[in-house]
């Protein structure tokens, strides 16, 4: 199996003169059945890169949709780096080789490709990759830095079809997520010249020991603000952060393999993916 990747090495720079949002045009118009999306948040610690990886693998290997991941979270490039680590483990691990062989025989899906780039070049490099490799993804997932002042982040948001904002029951994270969503809604979603159509919030890292009434209270506040909230709530699970290990102890978050069936059900990643697909169909 060949791994497609395209690298752009130029580092990002802080924005000194942000682009005028009113002049952003929909130069990358959506084609039928093809969406640009991003799991994004201003605050760290909500697992946006981990969620991007889990969703990419679930959609690609289980739902059999063609997925492209654009890793522009400079300088970490955590998804690209994870793919590199996993390929190194694969070289010396017959168990994972067997799992991949079985997965390919069932799904017919090769590895989803990852493009490593920077936010200011993200969409252009994704389009170049698709053209050069003749790869037509149905879903392109962009993993962007959490800092909106990073050059190209706002412009890339404007070229998405939909943004999904994870949040957890932490006052600082919630306030940041709600403020972030409201600003993007006013400046991007409500601008008819811009491609971005919707922003959806969803709960992650839900502690099952917390009272359901607490989240219901938060849900009411969010809806009063006029922000769309997804039904799926993701519980906290340590396997969200567990990559492939050389000892072969289970599959949680992997770029090479679909998450295990038990983990998929327990983590509700499958529920989240299918709810996202349903929402995308309404755009």
Regions found by a protein language model. Give the residues of each.
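Inter-motif core of Ras-like GTPase G domains
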Residues: 151-171
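P-loop/Walker-type NTP enzyme "switch/lid" segment
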Residues: 40-46, 60-140
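Generic structural signal for small/hydrophobic residues in well-ordered secondary structure
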Residues: 44, 78-79, 161, 180, ...
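Conserved C-terminal guanine-recognition region of P-loop GTPase G domains, centered on the G4
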Residues: 177-193
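Inter-lobe coupling/hinge region of RecA-like P-loop helicase motors
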Residues: 241-273, 277
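Extreme N-terminal, non-catalytic leader segments
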Residues: 1-42
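Beta-strand-loop-alpha "switch" segments that mediate conformational coupling across diverse proteins
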Residues: 205-254
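Walker A (P-loop) phosphate-binding motif
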Residues: 27-65
């Amino acid at each position: 199996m060949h791994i497609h990747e395209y690298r752009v090495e130029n580092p990002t720079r802080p924005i000194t003169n942000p682009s005028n949002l009113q002049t952003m045009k929909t130069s990358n118009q959506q084609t039928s059945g093809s969406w640009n999306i991003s799991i994004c948040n201003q605050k760290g610690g909500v697992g946006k890169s981990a969620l991007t990886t889990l969703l990419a693998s679930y959609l690609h290997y289980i739902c059999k949709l063609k997925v492209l991941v654009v890793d522009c979270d400079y300088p970490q490039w955590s998804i690209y780096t994870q793919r590199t680590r996993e390929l190194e483990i694969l070289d010396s691990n017959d168990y994972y080789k067997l799992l991949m062989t079985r997965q390919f025989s069932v799904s017919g899906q090769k590895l989803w490709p990852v493009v490593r780039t920077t936010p200011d070049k993200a969409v252009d490099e994704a389009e170049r990759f698709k053209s050069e490799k003749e790869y037509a993804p149905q879903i392109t997932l962009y993993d962007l830095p959490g800092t909106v002042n990073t050059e190209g982040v706002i412009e890339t948001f404007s070229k998405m079809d939909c943004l999904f904002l994870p949040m957890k029951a932490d006052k600082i994270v919630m306030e940041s997520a709600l403020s972030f969503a409201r600003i993007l809604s006013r400046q991007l979603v409500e601008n008819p010249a811009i491609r971005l159509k919707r922003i959806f919030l969803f709960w992650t890292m839900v502690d099952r020991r917390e009272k359901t009434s607490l989240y219901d209270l938060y849900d009411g506040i969010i809806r009063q603000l006029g922000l769309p909230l997804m039904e799926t709530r993701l519980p906290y699970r340590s396997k969200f952060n567990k990559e492939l290990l050389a000892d072969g102890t289970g599959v949680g978050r992997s770029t090479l393999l679909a998450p295990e069936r038990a983990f998929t059900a327990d983590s509700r990643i499958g529920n989240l993916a299918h709810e996202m697909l349903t929402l995308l169909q309404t755009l």
